[in-house]
Amino acid sequence: FKSAMKEYYAKAGLPTARWHIVEGLEDALDFAHTVGYPVVVKPDNGVGANNTYKLSSDEDLEFFMDHKGDEVYIMEEYVRGYVQTFDAIVDSKGQPLFESGNITPESIMDIVNDNRDSTYYLVKDVPENIRSAGLRTVKAFGVKSRFIHLEFFVLSEDQAGLGKKGDVLGLEVNMRPAGGYTPDMYNYSQETDVYKIWADMVCFDKNTKPIGAHHYCAFYGRRDGTHYKLDDYEIMMKYAGHIVMNGRIPDALSGAMANQMYVGRFDTEAEMNAFYHDLAEHF
């Protein structure tokens, strides 16, 4: 449960957004008025951005309460920042055998609810502040012998009660690899094989697979029905030396990942940003 994760983040010395388990309209309104709008509501026991909403007024909250059904929801104050992760395969002592992480520039909640294009990328190297937060979280949760995908907020501005710009907050833990095509992106990003590393962890409690040079690995998902300036052929020609995956996204994943995906590998952030710009341009 998302609410149960909060105490373990506290053990790791990481703040989290203020939260409340929604019971009725009156208590939900009290919490929203205490922290201020917008607030975010999501199932306390759920995956990804399914049934996750940003509420900006009493009217939004009343509409949500009228339609939420019997599911238990957690309500949190809205955090002004972006999501960065610490992903790893850890051994029986909780020590990483492989490390990576991604940045999601836009909220997955907004991508799903507003039907936006989908973007995220694997960083070339995990920043020390995220690595430190990740390792402390691993210790607090007592994680051993598994793949992990730990999510953190990085504040994009000072926020009263939470911290200063650049501070790291706990968001959610996932005792699994990141979803979608990310496991393959790990391999492209570090010229390795995380499937082999995971098997080595299970069988030998160590890694026997070398890890190569590090790169940025960028995902871009386009939506059907949008008229983009560059078509599929033009993208494939322009980025032939960089694109490592492309194709249709299964409909079951299209809410968060869009319909047509391109994954590119780059040595510099500037190259990656140019790739994003070219794929995003539309009429």
Please place each PLM-identified region on the residue numbering.
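A short secondary-structure junction signal
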Residues: 51-52, 182-185
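Peripheral (often C-terminal) accessory segments that flank ATP-dependent C-N-forming ligase machineries
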Residues: 197-283
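Phosphate-binding core of ATP-grasp and ATP-grasp-like enzymes
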Residues: 68-72, 78-120, 127-169, 174-182, ...
